[in-house]
């Protein structure tokens, strides 16, 4: 899109051009490579880091678009700072993300969809784990792009593990990691148990995941779940389940869209390190689901500055 804007700017200058960046490619890359983006923000040179991280082509197009379009915008104050430092161009205006409010069901339809979502989530968990789940279990989730550190997936797993081992849990908890990965196929054993309503009495093989992956041995989520010592045994108060498919209603296991899953949650957690805005916590709040975000997310910073308490 940036290249298109540059082409129009040169060939048809009578047409006004606008470029909105929802992140900077070099900022995302710095954060994803375990470098301290925010602690040393004022010391980074975008061109130098692009060369170091092999991001020169993408960074160059992005930078030229920022400098030469008629109007350059971004979605949050934290990303505006990033643009100024790494692209050498402050946005002309910050336009916070948002969406129309009418995509959330209301009244009886909301209650119906929430009940259906909880029933589906708990049923899949029971088939996978081979044990009963309390109908009133606390269902919590995280979701987003598979950026293990940037999206705080590692922090989410660690937080769930601390809760699991705290010895203070009174209520059963099922934590879902709804992050698309390199899926090979929906699990045939789990799919059969769901479709034929087979009551499983023992956990399925690798009872942490709903779909098989191409790269199971190298998957960071599965490896950290195992490293942390999760067992998903019936005796454990907290279970964790990785849902690595796109939730488009055709995944083969849940067969529900993301929103039709989100509505069944009791809480969501998005502990992002790099999050220019953060649709996920905003969507969660829109659905009436309490959420945790961070003060490094654009939405988190906006909420902290703009609204608080009951006004949120």
Locations of regions flagged by a protein language model:
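Catalytic cores of nucleotide-sugar-dependent glycosyltransferases that transfer UDP/GDP/TDP-activated
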Residues: 1-312
């Amino acid at each position: 899109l940036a290249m298109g804007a540059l082409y129009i700017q040169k060939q048809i200058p009578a047409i006004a051009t606008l470029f909105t960046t929802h992140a900077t490619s070099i900022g995302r890359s710095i954060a994803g490579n375990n470098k301290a983006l925010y602690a040393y923000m004022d010391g980074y040179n975008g061109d130098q880091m692009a060369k170091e991280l092999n991001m020169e082509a993408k960074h160059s197009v992005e930078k030229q678009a920022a400098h030469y379009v008629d109007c350059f915008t971004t979605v949050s104050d934290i990303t505006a700072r990033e643009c100024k430092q790494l692209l050498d161009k402050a946005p002309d205006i910050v336009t916070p993300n948002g969406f129309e409010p009418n995509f959330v069901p209301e009244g009886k339809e909301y209650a119906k969809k929430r009940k259906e979502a909880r029933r589906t989530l708990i049923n899949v968990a029971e088939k996978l784990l081979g044990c009963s789940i309390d109908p009133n279990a606390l269902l919590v989730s995280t979701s987003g792009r598979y950026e293990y550190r940037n999206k705080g997936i590692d922090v989410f797993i660690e937080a769930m593990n601390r809760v699991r081992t705290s010895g203070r849990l009174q209520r059963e908890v099922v934590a879902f990691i709804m992050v698309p990965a390199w899926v090979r196929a929906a699990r045939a054993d789990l799919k059969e148990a769901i479709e034929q309503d087979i009551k499983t009495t023992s956990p399925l093989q690798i009872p942490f995941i709903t779909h098989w992956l191409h790269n199971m041995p190298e998957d960071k989520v599965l490896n950290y779940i195992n490293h942390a010592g999760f067992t998903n045994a019936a005796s454990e108060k907290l279970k964790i389940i990785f849902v690595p498919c796109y939730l488009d209603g055709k995944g083969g296991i849940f067969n529900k869209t993301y929103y039709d899953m989100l509505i069944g949650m009791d809480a969501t957690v998005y502990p992002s390190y790099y999050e220019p805005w953060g649709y996920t916590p905003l969507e969660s709040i829109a659905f009436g689901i309490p959420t945790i975000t961070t003060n490094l997310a654009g939405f988190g910073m906006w909420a902290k500055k703009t609204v608080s308490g009951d006004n949120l």
